[in-house]
Amino acid sequence: MKYIVMQDVFFIVLLLVLAVPLGIYMYKVMIGEKVFLSRVLEPVERFGYRLMGVNAAGMSAKRYAGSVLAFSAVGFIFVMAVLMLQGFLPLNPEGMKGLSFSLAFNTAASFVSNTNWQAYSGEAALSYFSQSIGLTVQNFVSAATGIAVLFAVIRGFIWKKQKTVGNFWQDLFRVTLYILLPLSLVLAILLVSQGVVQSFADYSVVESLENGAKQLIPLGPAASQIAIKQLGTNGGGFFGANSAFPFENPSSFTNLLEMLAILLIPVALVVMFGRAVKDSKQGRAIMTAMMIVFVVGVVAITISEQFAGPSYQGVTTSGSMEGKEVRFGVGGSSLFAASTTAASNGAVNAMHDSLTPLGGLVPMFFMQLGEVIFGGVGSGLYGMIGFIILTVFIAGLLVGRTPEYLGKKIEPYDMKMVCLLILVPPLLTLFGTAVAVMMPSVQASVSASGAHGFSEVLYAFTSMGNNNGSAFAGFAADTTFTNMVGAVMMLLARFIPLIAALYLAQNMAGKSPVAASSGTLSTKNGMFIGLLIGVVVLVGALSFLPALALGPIADFFTTFK
């Protein structure tokens, strides 16, 4: 246990050390200031703008949102076409056939929405072309879209009397070129150096050492996709077993790299926010709130897995190793599970369906909080800003003052947008789960009975309704109902809050800041951090406690038998 604690502390310290300079760098990218890569990348940037015909003029929230939707729609159609026609496309040495309409629809929606929910196994269903040209490209642009929208939201708080929130095409291009591509290149090289596969060769047929039986070894350009899948909080694995598969994550060192990559940009964006609003204490307050909830979650998962359930007492001293890789152990698996669900990533290095009931409850609850504990790149922070505004609003009601945040008054229109930001994911999750449990096809998809079977369904629709993408693997997801309903849920969960955030940003940008007074609520002290954590957890608890009581909590009490 001491080793696990040291490992977790080392990880968090290293994460913060790396995130601070990256956050400062991203702030410079956001405002268009020169960075150390400018000499190399500025000519590429100018050429890209000319090629795309980009006009640098500012956009209103309506035009910005329209550009996001149009760009995403084109990506959706392209990915769906590639997946359905992959049998006729190049880079298909294994002769993979095109996906069915429902599965292609679900997969396209999943990757365009930055969810990366996978109802297929990559090495058995997709060609190299589909993986690299279809899905990897979406991993870049869906992540860049989230960060671009966050840039727009931040401008809403720092601009005065403006009717625009920035230019989507410029934001998208700069995020991709200056942030995601360089980081992905470095991480991909590190992963390849540690044994992660990167090849366009045919699958290999080898004889096993044990009995001489023939075995098919899948290959592919995995490292390049894994780099952006983690950095962009995408999470979709090149192989079906995701980061539990040795070709994706062969050692403890690559496990550390991938966990750092999952949280690096979300944490750095909080640093960037503090720099952008000219008050680092605001960023530190948000970081502290996120980190407290994250650490509590890590501790809860680790204890649940290390000491298992009451019925297992005295049976094992190494903790619950079911569904875990020996090279990662309980500590590495628990930290990865917390990171991937706190950050809206969804990659796994252990099977979440095999976690103990309380160990599985924590990742599920992290998602049900709205993916705001670090959350997805961009989307996590603008979701947390929604919770901050809600907290300020509640505090204002308590003391009878007009609520303010960063000098901008919070008005009824702002609260309507915040409600859309906060309430859409839980409504989609609960509605989807309620409908699903009544469908015979979903009931047949569940591998377990009772409370754990319900947990599998709840986890699946929580994952899709909050754009995470991880799953309890006992849930067979490739059915027409789950594919179609899940796809609609993922798209709505992505784009309704995104559009609400943009309209919130425009309304804020049009306001004049008001001077702080003695009655202004401080949003950077310990009291506010406690209030913020309370609001985030309370909204999640009120929304999901009845469902959790029927699932993982009831499942936990079965371990007393």
Swiss-Prot record:
- Keyword Flavoprotein assigned to the entry: answer is no
Q: How does it sit in the membrane?
A: Multi-pass membrane protein
List localization entries.
Answer: Cell membrane
Any one cellular-component term (Gene Ontology): plasma membrane
Q: What is its main location?
A: membrane
Q: Where are the transmembrane segments?
A: 4-24, 65-85, 133-153, 177-197, 253-273, 285-305, 380-400, 417-437, 484-504, 528-548
Q: Which UniProt keywords apply?
A: Cell membrane, Ion transport, Membrane, Potassium, Potassium transport, Transmembrane, Transmembrane helix, Transport
Q: Name one Pfam family in it.
A: KdpA
What does the record give under GO molecular function? P-type potassium transmembrane transporter activity; potassium ion binding
User: In terms of domain of life, where is this protein from?
Assistant: Bacteria
InterPro entries this protein is in? KdpA (IPR004623)
Family the UniProt entry places it in: Belongs to the KdpA family.
Function of this protein?
Answer: Part of the high-affinity ATP-driven potassium transport (or Kdp) system, which catalyzes the hydrolysis of ATP coupled with the electrogenic transport of potassium into the cytoplasm. This subunit binds the extracellular potassium ions and delivers the ions to the membrane domain of KdpB through an intramembrane tunnel.
State whether it acts alone or in a complex, and with which partners, per the record.
The system is composed of three essential subunits: KdpA, KdpB and KdpC.
Q: What is this protein called?
A: Potassium-transporting ATPase potassium-binding subunit
What species does this protein belong to? Answer: Listeria innocua serovar 6a (strain ATCC BAA-680 / CLIP 11262)
Gene, per the UniProt record: kdpA
